[in-house]
Amino acid sequence: MSDQVIIFDTTLRDGEQALSASLTVKEKLQIAFALERLGVDVIEAGFPISSPGDFESVRTIAKHIKNSRICALSRAVTKDIDVAADALKVAEAFRIHTFISTSTVHVQDKLRRSYDDVVEMGVKAVQRARKYTDDVEFSCEDAGRTPIDNLCRMVEAAINAGANTINIPDTVGYTIPGEFGGIIQTLFNRVPNIDKAIISVHCHDDLGMSVANSIAAVQAGARQVEGTINGIGERAGNCSLEEIAMILQTRSEYLGVHTSLKNDEIHRTSKLVSQLCNMPIQSNKAIVGANAFSHSSGIHQDGMLKNKNTYEIMTPESIGLKNKALNLTSRSGRAAVKSHMDSMGYKAEEYNLDTLYADFVKLADRKGQVFDYDLEALMHFANLRDEDDFYKLNYLSVQSGSVMATTSIKLLCGDEEKCEAAVGNGPVDALYQCIYKLTGYEIVLDKFDLTAKGEGEDGLGQADIIANYKGRKYHGTGLATDIIEASGQALLHVINSIHRADQIAEIKQNKITTV
């Protein structure tokens, strides 16, 4: 049996199900590039049949990612599988992941089929997927609550049909480690063709057991672990891949396995996912939380000063947690910025150098010394902006007293510059009133967050909002050294997304009318 554990990331599919507002194709591609840098073996890019947006995301990621295998999910339905293959075909090699429910409650109450029918559907799905690729994964949904005899039968049939990865999900996070490890061990003992497939696990965190269950499965012989960055996902979330990575590294001698991950990319990847998904990381989160490497107890601090190994089982550097000052000023050239981006592992296709450099110069003029996290934040935010944004903030002035604030703005609306002033309960409220008046959009804010993206008083501030417009949710983000400006950028991000959606709807309607 191999001692390498394959890492299967489903942040862009299962993880996205936890978000209030869907990620854009650009945002998903950014995350995919980060996962590729991290060394993830398989990236589950989406569920193509679910929406045109998901189809386009999978297709785009399959086109651009070269060093990780791209996978798409499909039900055990012919059309699902065909659409998944169509989205993936631009990749040099790809995986189709098809699934069907196998637990008694799912088979009887959801599918309303006999178990014989379910086995036949699973077999046909695998055979259909094999027409497109020799890399097929089959999942037994709710395997954790499936009678073991039925599970063994389904696994054997799927392998005979051509599945070379068999996934055993604890879909509702019901099992505990000894129990789940026992399920995996039983499959190895009772399924005669088990040696022809890699056994994978996909554990949810409803009882807080997802990581522990995954490790128990690895000890029992599983050689693929599925999960998400920061453990994001439906309900209580998924198995946290950064925790799996550091467990397998820190306890490698005991467990006897390893991964191909570049663990020093963990912090950067975690931060990006948190930022784009607008999901803050709890401070005491293992591995990537703000307090993960903090020591406040006097006894602990004394021990750390004498020998870090007294209270530190891994180093901050092992996950890439380090801040290096850039020796760049506003007088530095593009080549210097590009050289530093290269040293951080970013490819030229991941950012526009001219845009990044222009933003860098503005920031350097404001705060002087620029750090890695500043440059990365500028890059990620620049990637969210579109050159064809209809609304652009040209000027902002704020006068604020103890109670009310007055804001004046100049907003570029297409080719026309418009001016507006408004009074509000604070500068952000006044700014938003100006923008509402000039754009005419009636938007309901569901969530508004401000977070620091650097250190010190002159650091960057990020504004994240979730807005509701005509029953649809939109996510907007803004970044600036001034939090009021960042707040305005976040709202304009939303309004430009709405404007583009309205334009597309109008074009579609005109086509229908013409026909």
Curated annotation (Swiss-Prot):
Task: Extract the ranges annotated as region (Regulatory domain).
Answer: 392-515
Pathway(s)? Amino-acid biosynthesis; L-leucine biosynthesis; L-leucine from 3-methyl-2-oxobutanoate: step 1/4
Listed under catalytic activity are: 3-methyl-2-oxobutanoate + acetyl-CoA + H2O = (2S)-2-isopropylmalate + CoA + H(+)
**Which keywords does this chain's UniProt record carry?**
Amino-acid biosynthesis, Branched-chain amino acid biosynthesis, Cytoplasm, Leucine biosynthesis, Manganese, Metal-binding, Transferase
Manganese among keywords: yes
What's one GO MF term for it? Answer: acetyl-CoA C-acetyltransferase activity
- The answer to whether the entry has keyword NADP is no
Role description: Catalyzes the condensation of the acetyl group of acetyl-CoA with 3-methyl-2-oxobutanoate (2-ketoisovalerate) to form 3-carboxy-3-hydroxy-4-methylpentanoate (2-isopropylmalate).
Into which family does the record put it?
Belongs to the alpha-IPM synthase/homocitrate synthase family. LeuA type 1 subfamily.
Output this protein's name.
2-isopropylmalate synthase
Per the UniProt entry, what species is this protein from, by scientific name? Answer: Aliivibrio salmonicida (strain LFI1238)
List the top taxonomic levels of the source: Bacteria, Pseudomonadati, Pseudomonadota, Gammaproteobacteria, Vibrionales
